[in-house]
Amino acid sequence: MLILSFLCPAFLNAQIVTDERMFSFEEPQLPACITGVQSQLGISGAHYKDGKHSLEWTFEPNGRLELRKDLKFEKKDPTGKDLYLSAFIVWIYNEQPQDAAIEFEFLKDGRKCASFPFGINFKGWRAAWVCYERDMQGTPEEGMNELRIVAPDAKGRLFIDHLITATKVDARQQTADLQVPFVNAGTTNHWLVLYKHSLLKPDIELTPVSDKQRQEMKLLEKRFRDMIYTKGKVTEKEAETIRKKYDLYQITYKDGQVSGVPVFMVRASEAYERMIPDWDKDMLTKMGIEMRAYFDLMKRIAVAYNNSEAGSPIRKEMRRKFLAMYDHITDQGVAYGSCWGNIHHYGYSVRGLYPAYFLMKDVLREEGKLLEAERTLRWYAITNEVYPKPEGNGIDMDSFNTQTTGRIASILMMEDTPEKLQYLKSFSRWIDYGCRPAPGLAGSFKVDGGAFHHRNNYPAYAVGGLDGATNMIYLFSRTSLAVSELAHRTVKDVLLAMRFYCNKLNFPLSMSGRHPDGKGKLVPMHYAIMAIAGTPDGKGDFDKEMASAYLRLVSSDSSSAEQAPEYMPKVSNAQERKIAKRLVENGFRAEPDPQGNLSLGYGCVSVQRRENWSAVARGHSRYLWAAEHYLGHNLYGRYLAHGSLQILTAPPGQTVTPTTSGWQQEGFDWNRIPGVTSIHLPLDLLKANVLNVDTFSGMEEMLYSDEAFAGGLSQGKMNGNFGMKLHEHDKYNGTHRARKSFHFIDGMIVCLGSDIENTNMDYPTETTIFQLAVTDKAAHDYWKNNAGEGKVWMDHLGTGYYVPVAARFEKNFPQYSRMQDTGKETKGDWVSLIIDHGKAPKAGSYEYAILPGTDRKTMTAFAKKPAYSVLQQDRNAHILESPSDRITSYVLFETPQSLLPGGLLQRTDTSCLVMVRKESADKVLLTVAQPDLALYRGPSDEAFDKDGKRMERSIYSRPWIDNESGEIPVTVTLKGRWKVVETPYCKVVSEDKKQTVLRFLCKDGASYEVELEK
């Protein structure tokens, strides 16, 4: 049974959970099943971790505490379907550290089955989560009915609380620390290696600190302080808010011992997942006892202290409150060597810890607590991880997001010693390598501007990671510790790409990860920080491109009233205005809206921009998943990357947002993501069936195709194309296939599909041309009498559509749907234009063109004389030409078996993307791309079940995910003799009057181009 705890003092000390396996010692009498040998046992209120009491155990040398009852141990599921393991969980309090260990023994009818040691060389609370079958010595057995805790060969006293004899837990997350260093020994998860990495040693030698280095340390400290703190005033309202929040924790001292409301990390609730009905992973946060709010308050107090006058009563009060909170949280186990049993993703909970301690460095020094605080920060920031020279480029995006601030704070907390200098050199090198382009699907940044987390381009995680990366690049800029030009330029290119695919600030829907809610945005401040960090080569004090990008982005209402998602870094408007003013005073001006074309091979994304609009295509492949689904996140977005094409637009002079582009969540039919070819399912069937499929992953779904061909080409950064072989995963409708292409030529986007097929006889297959929300009177009036005219359609947002095939218009006022996270019903007024391929189609196809920012007159003229003609549209290739633009666009799904139509390009020796632009009578621009990332070659690495169906497996289980993109040679044969200036990636194989043969070496899904001359 769960005992609810509300945010008021009377409830904050309530026992969290009651269960027969859980001992919290809240009754006045000792439980009858507990006895002692050479021990004194009692219930104590001196220290407590759950409720207000704990078990006090005073022992003689080798004394024993015995608990006799069924321990409820359960073996692991022999079928392998349930991956959880039985764990023993306990919290121990020690007043006097001893360099010794107690032994936990688990017996069945008096016979010892399993055991583990627990070190007691600490003061305060420590926890252990120990899996019986993986972490303990011996062999646990079902029916074990006794727990013994054996004292060391010395007397002492411990307090025990929150003891759970056995409960099934996610076996990935238990964490080793100084007390239980053997737990989960095989893990390499970057959240869980605090103990292992605390043992790392430096490879950079200690050297004396020179005067110049001492000056740089002061500069770094000033820059960091300015980064995390802006001088202000302490208002009476702020002081009163702090007092109220502080009082909730009921911190008191008695006989030199501190106590107060117990504080946990959010993941501690995972102990109860299999113990209580309606378990909520955020229950501790809702109960007001999670440490994120605690550290946020500590930071708030630190800021108030720094904002108050020296010697003032408020300053003295804030100092007292901070030190009391410091003592209490240290006592609660936030200390060197402690991991609370389960610590995964703790970085989000302790974010306020680092700036809070750093801002109170002088106070901690005066109180004699600075060394202890330094060690605490270095432990949780895993600062020793920076010691060894990185073996390769890249680090996890979470490290940039949650560890950079902590690591630099833990280092800058130190006095100016050779050890501090050694840490700074190691840290700047770690940042440098972390910012460089990472291989394969590794985090964080890609050579093409992609920003990776969860093995895909993921802007929602990138905004947090870029906060750390940009701040650290700025911090070290123009010092002897500055990052390399490659590292600096890579992060700059990521930001330039992000401001290209976002419009104006918002992520495209298909690039929103598991948050398709229209709220995710880039962070203009990242551009500001990079602007004042100077140029990548270190020669310029300002970066002009970053400055002008920032001034364009910040001119939007970037801090609007709507609630920003939790994952977005918080930035003050005052800070934005301050840097904007500085840049303008230095002569910088906002850039115009970006124009051109961008292809992200490491995102399976193509973007075309003209005027203020953008068109964003996204697909998926055997390397890059289609959508990420969690329980309660993105329940219906299965088709987000099934060849989608979103038009982001607004009337001239207005800021582009999802709303101005005709999108809202209310009433949106998740089957009809624009551009996709999909089976139109009832929402119950479209809803993700989220599973825990292996030990490498949690409860999540990220499905892959078995096709390598998916991605885009960009010619001269102005035009491009995109192609994909669509093959849905067998988990749902594995017979569904299509060949899809988009051709981006100036202000025209031509969309082609062929070979659409599946065997689903129950529901129709559709290609969605548009689905738009109708939200105001003008839009309702527009659609009242508008049903299109034959091949020409104009929507109410100024986008024109040329549809030479049969299409169906739907006006659903209202249209019902569901929220992506809760599944709650929504409704809104929507219009859709779709191509219906019928049920179980075979050899289905479509053709249409989109002209954003146009008018009906232009569209009518276009329909009479389209600016393109399709030369081939079948399983092998989609080829079209635009005579007025002198462009021929090739999406070659298969190796051509005969001469290609279109003139210049006669054949290629493999599938690829090609674009040819005739620049003059005897000059041609030729662009070639191979969208296959070639992280491995040969057939797709599928595993099949007994029925021959592709099994669902997590991306994290694949051995090739960190491989470099392989080089794929692409040989093209051109009609006639052409002169080519060879490059490292393009060589002439042969040439004569009839033909010229070139070989391109393609990798990274990149586009390679050469100029041909007669």
From Swiss-Prot:
User: What result is annotated for mutating residue 453 to N?
Assistant: Shows no activity against dermatan sulfate while retaining about 10% of its catalytic efficiency against chondroitin 4- and 6-sulfates
* Catalytic temperature dependence: Optimum temperature is 37 degrees Celsius. No significant reduction in activity at temperatures in the range of 25-40 degrees Celsius. At 50 degrees Celsius, activity of 45% for dermatan sulfate, 60% for chondroitin 4-sulfate and 75% for chondroitin 6-sulfate is detected. Thermal denaturation curve is bimodal with two consecutive thermal denaturation midpoints (Tm) corresponding to 44 and 50 degrees Celsius, respectively.
> Per the record, what are the reactions this protein catalyses?
Exolytic removal of Delta(4)-unsaturated disaccharide residues from the non-reducing ends of both polymeric chondroitin/dermatan sulfates and their oligosaccharide fragments
Per the UniProt entry, the effect of residue 172 to A is:
Loss of activity against all substrates
Q: Where is the signal peptide?
A: 1-14
Q: What enzyme class is recorded for this protein?
A: lyase
Can you name one GO molecular function term for this protein? carbohydrate binding
The annotation note on the cofactor reads: Divalent metal cation. Requires divalent metal cation for binding of dermatan sulfate substrate, whereas it is not necessary for the binding of chondroitin sulfate substrates. Prefers Ca(2+) or Mg(2+), binding 1 ion per subunit.
Consequence recorded when altering residue 461 to A: Loss of activity against all substrates
Marked site (Transition state stabilizer) residue numbers: 514
Residues marked Important for catalytic activity against all substrates (site): 172, 628
Which residues does Ca(2+) bind?
24, 26, 50, 53, 161
Regulation of its activity: Specific activity for chondroitin sulfate substrates increases moderately (2-fold) while an increase of 25-fold is observed for dermatan sulfate as substrate upon addition of Ca(2+) or Mg(2+) ions. Increasing the concentration of Na(+), K(+) or Cs(+) chloride from 0 to 0.1 M, increases the activity against all substrates. Further increases in salt concentration reduces the activity dramatically, with 50% inhibition occurring at 0.15 M and nearly complete inhibition at 0.4 M salt.
Q: Could you tell me which Pfam families the record lists for this protein?
A: Lyase_8, Lyase_catalyt, Lyase_N
Question: What are the catalytic residues?
Answer: 345, 454, 461
pH dependence, record text: Optimum pH is 7.6. Decreased activity at pH values below 7.0 and above 8.0. The activity against chondroitin 6-sulfate remains higher than with other substrates at low pH. At pH 6.5 the enzyme exhibits almost 60% of its maximal activity against chondroitin 6-sulfate, only 20% activity against chondroitin 4-sulfate and no measurable activity against dermatan sulfate. In contrast, at pH of 8.5 about 30% of enzyme's maximal activity against all substrates is displayed.
Q: Name the coenzymes or cofactors required.
A: Ca(2+); Mg(2+)
Check the record and name the InterPro entries matching this protein: Chondroitin_ABC_lyase, Chondroitin_lyas, Chondroitinase_ABC_I, Gal_mutarotase_sf_dom, Galactose-bd-like_sf, GH-type_carb-bd, Lyase_8-like_C, Lyase_8_central_dom
Oligomeric and partner information: Monomer.
- What is the role of this chain? Broad-specificity glycosaminoglycan lyase, which acts in an exolytic fashion degrading chondroitin sulfates and dermatan sulfate to yield only disaccharide products. Has a preference for chondroitin 4-sulfate over chondroitin 6-sulfate. Has extremely low activity against hyaluronic acid. Is not active against acharan sulfate, heparin or heparan sulfate.
| Protein name per the record | Chondroitin sulfate ABC exolyase
The species this protein belongs to is Bacteroides thetaiotaomicron
Tell me what gene encodes this: chonabc
